[in-house]
């Protein structure tokens, strides 16, 4: 029985990344897959879906099944919103996580917020705009004292620097 659950959990972790149909995810959960299962890096289905899957419906199905929106992976202490801000090309994923109660200004182990991660790494400016629209702290600093605007300058994100300055960032 344990081997069967382990197999279901692996399928759920994979489906979180690739599924485009909610019924696929719901079927695995109905069979007994653990919504809190972790892969070898400590990532849960909600974290993987936030990072790699642009299907908001899959994300919502995981949330409805009880996924922990605030849980952070063990190495970098990044949660689902951090992971989405870092790599997702979908502002709808960001909006869905925020609507579900994700902490907009939560920090990872370096003190980076979702906005810092998006400004530094995500080429999709609509993701950054979604975080700003939601009220992300434009003057947040990581634990070394680097600000959002400094990250934007270092990443050569001229448009973002201009937008942040217009909003009063320093």
Task: List each model region and its residues.
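Ankyrin repeat structural motif
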Residues: 21-29, 53-64, 89-98, 123-132, ...
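Ankyrin repeat A-helix N-terminal signature
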Residues: 15-20, 48-55, 83-90, 117-124, ...
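Ankyrin-repeat-protein effector appendages
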Residues: 1-12, 100, 134, 143-144, ...
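Ankyrin-repeat boundary/"N-cap" motif
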Residues: 5-14, 38-45, 72-80, 107-113, ...
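Intrinsically disordered, low-complexity regulatory segments in ankyrin-centric signaling systems
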Residues: 1-31, 39-43, 47, 64, ...
């Amino acid at each position: 029985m344990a081997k069967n659950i382990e197999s279901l959990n692996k399928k759920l972790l994979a489906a979180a990344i690739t599924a485009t149909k909610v019924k696929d995810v719901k079927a695995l959960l109905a069979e007994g897959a653990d919504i809190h299962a972790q892969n070898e890096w400590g990532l849960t289905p909600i974290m993987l879906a936030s990072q790699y899957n642009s299907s908001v419906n899959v994300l919502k199905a995981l949330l409805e099944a009880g996924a922990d929106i605030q849980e952070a992976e063990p190495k970098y202490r990044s949660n689902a919103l951090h992971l989405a801000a870092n790599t997702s090309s979908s502002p709808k994923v960001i909006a869905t996580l925020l609507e579900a109660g994700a902490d907009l200004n939560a920090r990872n182990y370096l003190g980076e917020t979702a906005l810092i991660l998006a400004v530094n790494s995500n080429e999709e400016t609509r993701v950054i705009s979604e975080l700003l629209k939601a009220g992300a702290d434009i003057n947040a600093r990581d634990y070394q004292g680097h600000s959002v605007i400094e990250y934007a300058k270092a990443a050569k994100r001229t448009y973002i620097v201009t937008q942040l300055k217009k909003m009063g960032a320093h």
